[in-house]
Regions:
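Metal-dependent phosphoester/phosphodiester hydrolase catalytic core
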Residues: 1-211
């Protein structure tokens, strides 16, 4: 995930900003672990999954069946590179107290604490913006009743505070010297020029609070 040149560059940047109140890291793919729950218990195998549209009903069923092993969902994210993730989080812990990681890619609104493997205190807070138009987690794993996949993932991953895998929108992050506040916002439709905006989950952290 990080070559030696990139890792050295990042450490130099972290050292140079040690006196800043907040440390924001913008990067592409999910850092927090995302282990699969046993989706056989919650997913509708006959649901209108976008996985079926891009692959096949048979492949979708195999993916659901494989979830019983509780493997990471995203092996092309940091979950596929656990040693690199540990190195990255060690850098953050070494140089900053107020670490906020901003992420996209998964098309799902997520808020999660980031831990080193043997630590009880989180190193950073990860904020993942929802999709603008692309399908999210619940669109891949439809349930009956709806939107139960996200809840199942939270139960399997206690470091995750929030998952919204259907609605489309954006994430706002406001920083002051005293606190950080993140607000997930959603639109009622992406198919029409007129829409309503609603507020979803929000989280506030104080500066120098264990995150």
């Amino acid at each position: 995930m990080l070559g030696s040149w990139q890792k050295n560059w990042l450490e130099q940047q972290l050292k140079a900003t040690q006196n800043q109140r907040w440390n924001l890291i913008g990067q592409q793919v999910m850092v927090a672990p995302l282990l699969q729950p046993d989706l056989r218990e919650v997913v509708d195998p006959n649901g209108n999954s976008v996985f079926v549209k891009s692959h096949s009903r048979e492949a979708y069923q195999k993916a659901i069946d494989a979830s019983k092993y509780n493997l990471p969902l995203l092996l092309d994210a940091w979950d596929g590179y656990p040693e690199a993730r540990e190195d990255f989080l060690q850098l953050l812990k070494r140089h900053h107290n107020n670490n906020i990681v901003l992420t996209g890619d998964i098309h799902t609104g997520i808020c999660a604490d980031l831990y080193l493997e043997d630590d009880e205190q989180p190193v950073a807070l990860e904020l993942i913006t929802p999709a603008v138009t692309s399908p999210g987690l619940d669109d891949y794993f439809p349930t009956n009743p709806q939107q139960q996949a996200g809840k199942a993932f939270i139960q399997q991953n206690p470091h995750i505070h929030y998952i919204e895998g259907t609605l489309k929108g954006w994430l706002e992050v406001n920083l002051t010297q005293q606190q950080m506040r993140a607000q997930w916002n959603y639109v009622s439709t992406v198919k029409q020029p007129n829409y309503q905006v609603s507020q979803g989950y929000s989280i506030t952290r104080q500066a120098n609070e264990a995150v």
